[in-house]
């Protein structure tokens, strides 16, 4: 795993800003764009677009979203 994290939290898709680390299908992705009801996620291997209403984000030591 690339970053140290302190748990996860489920939030609505609109709360993910670019750079937020997201857990999706048991993999870590970085949110890159949140437009037109779609969230674009990327990692070193793939880029995907999701329309899920609720997503799971990683938290840092202060309980805030982990950003890169």
Regions found by a protein language model. Name each.
Residues 1-17:
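Mixed-charge, Lys/Arg-rich low-complexity intrinsically disordered regions
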Residues 2-6, 48-68:
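Intrinsically disordered, low-complexity, charged/polar segments
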Residues 28-53, 57:
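Basic/aromatic-rich interaction segments and small domains that mediate binding to polyanionic partners
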